[in-house]
């Protein structure tokens, strides 16, 4: 789980602007697409279990948790201004800002720690036991050794080096 140099540079550039909007920068995807690239920014904020539901300025009920439309608008405006000034992306691009959603992608190993015991989808760089794709239960996140442990098919436990993870996301289960 390593960011490309381009993505890391974009992350470092926009992180202060995102934090100034009172949200956390969950991750960035930069996808070159011919003439028009895509910069997708995922934002999140901690859950406030004690918050009472309130009506926001748009008349929408907010439960004191999660990302709302106004959060996305604020971040889009702040980040858009920074990108206009620094111009780190050559050519045209679309800017998308959203929450990570129910099937949240993981960009850093630390992010997975909160989801131990849940199902994750993994795409690996190099095959492990002749497979590059897994749906598995997350058993352990070892930050010191930079690895995870997952249970595949309800019985088989694998240890996977975090540097071998190309893509990982949570599998939403009702």
UniProtKB/Swiss-Prot annotation:
InterPro entries per the UniProt record, alphabetical: Ribosome_maturation_RimP, RimP_C, RimP_C_sf, RimP_N, RimP_N_sf
Taxonomic superkingdom: Bacteria
Keywords: Cytoplasm, Ribosome biogenesis
Pfam families associated with the record: DUF150_C, RimP_N
Any one GO biological process: translation
GO cellular component: cytosol
Subcellular location(s) of the protein: Cytoplasm
NCBIfam families attached to this UniProt entry: PRK14631.1
Family as reported in the entry's similarity comment: Belongs to the RimP family.
Role played: Required for maturation of 30S ribosomal subunits.
UniProt xrefs under PANTHER family: RIBOSOME MATURATION FACTOR RIMP
Full protein name: Ribosome maturation factor RimP
Highest classification ranks of the organism: Bacteria, Pseudomonadati, Pseudomonadota, Gammaproteobacteria, Moraxellales
């Amino acid at each position: 789980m390593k960011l490309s140099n381009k993505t890391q540079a974009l992350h470092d550039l926009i992180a202060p602007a995102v934090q100034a909007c009172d949200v956390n920068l969950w991750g960035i995807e930069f996808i070159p697409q011919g003439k028009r690239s895509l910069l997708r920014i995922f934002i999140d904020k901690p859950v406030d279990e004690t918050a009472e539901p309130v009506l926001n300025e748009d008349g929408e009920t907010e439960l004191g948790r999660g990302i709302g439309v106004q959060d996305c608008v604020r971040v889009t405006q702040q980040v858009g201004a920074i990108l206009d000034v620094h111009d780190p992306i050559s050519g045209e691009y679309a800017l998308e800002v959203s929450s990570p959603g129910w099937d949240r992608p993981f960009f850093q190993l630390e992010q997975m720690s909160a989801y131990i015991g849940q199902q994750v989808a993994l795409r690996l760089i190099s095959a492990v036991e002749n497979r590059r794709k897994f749906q598995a239960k997350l058993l352990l996140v070892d930050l010191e050794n930079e690895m995870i442990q997952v249970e595949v098919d309800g019985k088989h436990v694998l240890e996977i080096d975090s540097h071998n993870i190309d893509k990982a996301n949570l599998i939403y289960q009702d």
